[in-house]
Amino acid sequence: MDPSLLHSSEEVKPTSNTSSGGSNYPSPNTAGQSHTTDNTSPSTVPQSQSTSQTHNQPPQPSSQSQSQPGQDTSALDDNESAKRPRLRLAHACDRCRRRKIRCDTQHPCTPCQQSNNVCTFETPSRRTVKSKGNSERVSSTGGVKRPHSPGRVFASLATGRGESQSNLEARLAALESMLRDVPPNVHNAFLSTLDARLGSGTGVGLKEGGGGGEGVGVAVEALAGTSLANLNLPGNLGYNMGGSELNAQRRLGQNTLSPDWAATGGLSGWLNDAVLGKKKEEAGMDELAKRLGGMSFFYEDEIGQAKWQGATSGFPLLHLLAAHNAPKEEDEADSADGDVSGEMMASPAADSIPSTSPNTSVILPRRISSSSTPAGRASSVHAKARSSSIGLGAIGRRASSADRRKKERFFPDRTPRPHQTLNPEASWKVITGVIPPDLMDTLVRCYLSTSHLLWPFLHVPSFLTDYANPAQWGEPGFTCFIVAVCTLSSRHVDDPRVRANPADPSTAGKQYFELFKRLRDLPSADRPTLYSIQAAFLAAIYAFGLGNLSKAFSLQAESITLCLDGGLHRSVDAYDHFDAIEKETRKRTFWSIYAWDKQSAALFGRPPIIHLRDCDVTEPLIVDDENLSPEGIKDESINSKSRMCAFVATIRLHVILEGVIDSATQPSAFPTSPFLARAAATIARRTAQNETLRDEEELLEEWKRILPKYWCYDTETANSRDPIRITQAERLHCLEHLVKMIIYRHRFSGFVAMPASTAEERARHLDLCRKAMQCALTIIADHVHISQRGMMTYYGVHVIHQLAQAGRTLVAVILNCRNADFRPIIAPSVEGLRSCVGLLRRFSGRYLCGLRSADIIDEFCRVCNIPVDSPRVPNSAGRPSPAWLRPVRKRVATPPPIADSPGSSGMMNFDPNTLTANSGAHASGVNDNMGISAGGVGNIGGPASDLDALFNTAAYFNVPGGEVSGGMAGTSTGSAPNVGNHNVNIGPSNSFLPTLGGLGEASAPYDRFETLSPNAELGNGNTMLSNYQDSHAGFSLSGDTDHPMGNGLGTSAGAGAGHISFDYGLNGHGFGGESLATKGMDNVSDGLKQGTGGSNLSAATILSLMEEGSFDYGSIFTDQAP
């Protein structure tokens, strides 16, 4: 391993240039993009003057129309030919003219041969014959004078010059033929604008495109690049739409779930509607003004790292003006090379569409395949600084000429700083000193088969290539990411080596988390590379699961900040700085972090950190990793069964959730400050809503309508043998009902402050409570179903968040039951609470935050005298639990809400036994059935009778909860001998707390069969991570030593020395942990074989039993029976 491979970019540029091609190599643009008859490779251009002129001009429909039947090519008079540039080999080639060096006028010339550049003679001579007339003035603004360009035909038609009527009609026929070849969106939106402005030079200066593919002027390109890209407007104004790359680009933008999904997403839909409805003359200016607030400025910093700054920084405007006022020679040079945006991000619109000119440099990916050249491997670490996390050799496409051109324009006398990296060998030794190599391989396998399915931001082939490359271990972001992966995966395996205390499963990954925090302090670890962003995101998820909320929110905020710094929230489709893989990975990474931000904001009552209005990045494409290459999509067909389809559906639900969160928060009135009150109303721009969240509810219905049937949760999905389909469909189903539940909870919470006074209002209050309860029960029933089938390993911390929300909602529903009308919903709510707390305790073996959420719900039930016989934690050993939260008292107590009806003076009796049995049960005694007398809330006792404090649970989570040393915690009520009696004195001393066992043993059978479980019935596994080293059989992921794991990713002393392969074939069996199975873990297979028969109950059956109040949680999970 040679650390010298990891130095600055200057050492690898010659290698990249050498591998790019030889002097006589035909232009890749010719081979990869053009299917037109006029497009010919520059290496085969004849040396005759007329042929050179024909083949070096960009192909236009007007030139194609010359061969069309019935077209009069003699319509152009002698004055037209006089205006053509005298292209003769006697003058210097384009490159020598730009560089102002001597050219020997050969084709190709000697300087171009020596520098491996294409030699062209496109630029017109400056000694062009200047004919007089109106047509010269029109064409002179175009830069390159094309005889059949639209501007020249328009000008000729306008002047006439006394042509005969037949000649004029022939010209009109030719013009109509040209217009028919123009796509409707381009024609309607821009053609008239171009016609009006081509010769005037006013406004933003729209100009004719030349061979470099300038197209629309720099101002419109810089401000409306994304819009123009979605309009499929190429550099030559759309007159040649036949290139294969251009068609691929058009299909790329449409590659979403289905036509319905495509119609509702993306920028092209609203842009077309907006532009086509306006006057053609004003379309460009309106679009310019619309995009003014969303200007982006991507740049490379001092080490070549791509970064972003927004409009208020002033850089976008300055760059726009600088590009618009650049000297003509520099503008022509940048246009001819077609690489302005790759170096200084000048013209996103022009660069987003591949040029069809044969002499224009093709828009190649910014990185090459890691296996293509040894040079690619050598340059991999520096590539991470520029192309973030994906692949190797990212600077392979940059030639030395491009770097020289960049230096000529910006800081020509300065060189970039070398990218600071680590010593790969030292980094490898430090990490493997904490995480053994064989265990690391297993944890990586586990991550790819579990957590990655929830947040699939990785391009797995590129990641596995980097994982096997020793040089990558010198990159700080990559090392942090590997440690973060191992930290999160440690919660999904049963190997004692992942635990800080081998006897305590709750300490799994803690030592890795400490290592991660140390690595984050290393130089360059905080740079906004994709691996650094992803590492902070995964570490935040682990911290949430650990219950360390302050650190979790800190890491989540860091990941979002790095996203903003790297511009992940902005679209980069218009820039060639990033290849197709990196563009998609940026999208996936950002939307994963965006969704988690909304999830945590909803659970903890915090405002989201980033909003949809701050972003313009599009949704990830519906394409699996095996069909995505640096050049683009291999198979462009839309597969509704793709795993990315479920991910996009998840993103859209979280977008709706943001609207729900925002609608629940109204701007403050600031009664003592009129200025702040006015400013708050102005900034919020939110009007009062009589029917709140109606728009969000309609969006939710639209989401449900366009969801592909394959991912709908129905009988067919529940009976599927594919665990990925089952778990993803149930995940979407739960998330949909989570959003609905928050909407209904927000609506009925209004009746707490202002109780219903009429029968109609009381009926509406009851209906909202019932709907919220049904959504909560649906979430709980789905998770019970997944858990009993042994497939909870495919889920993560989001399960705890959803169950916590469902439990709080059920508590709120029960506390709203103040009259006899609400009696039917009490028993189902209490039964749902019992199952909810049981699942949270069951999941606490993997994530401590589950125990915290269960204890908090239990404590609310105790304070409010809600009789929940909470299931215990499996295999608990006994340790006191901390006081997770204690509400801060207000100086003025809030009076309890008024009863809903005149005949009701207090809350109902919450004991389901009393509600369902017409016997002489004690309805008013707390000791027997924990009922509440009709005297109101006064009998609850203690200062906790403040109902407003009970409802405002979200504010409590800002109070840091105590963390037991070593991560151990019990519950306050779970294992009390008499669970029905909750008269426990919670005071400063914990001496009276009933002790519940800690988690000294795995939460069997949960942590054993719901880790990495087999699926032998599914046939071929889809994850095949293997190497040529001896398999590590020292432990079993299931804890069953009789069936050890035999396919580890063992590595030799050198990092990643083993050969890694990955099989992506779905084969109709999904993707994930089923291929990681051993014979000792057959619960997933059992669940799939039994389906809804045998001892397993379907989610619908569980929900029905809960609604009846007759579901027995302890009969399903006997290890948690009271």
Curated annotation (Swiss-Prot):
Biological processes annotated in GO? DNA-templated transcription; regulation of transcriptional start site selection at RNA polymerase II promoter
Q: Which chain regions cross the lipid bilayer?
A: none
Which SUPFAM superfamilies does this UniProt record tie to the protein?
Zn2/Cys6 DNA-binding domain
The UniProt annotation gives the DNA-binding region as 93-119
* Annotated Basic and acidic residues bias: 400-416
Position of the signal peptide: none
Chief location of this protein?
nucleus
An example GO CC term for this entry is: chromosome
Keywords, comma-separated and alphabetical? Chromosome, DNA-binding, Metal-binding, Nucleus, Transcription, Transcription regulation, Zinc
Key word Transcription present in the record?
yes
Q: Its biological function?
A: Transcription factor that regulates alternative transcription start site usage when cells switch from growth in exponential phase to stationary phase, and acts on genes involved in translation, glycolysis, glycogen synthesis and mitochondrial proteins.
Protein name (record): Transcription factor TUR1
User: Source species, please?
Assistant: Cryptococcus neoformans var. grubii serotype A (strain H99 / ATCC 208821 / CBS 10515 / FGSC 9487)
Give the classification, highest ranks.
Answer: Eukaryota, Fungi, Dikarya, Basidiomycota, Agaricomycotina
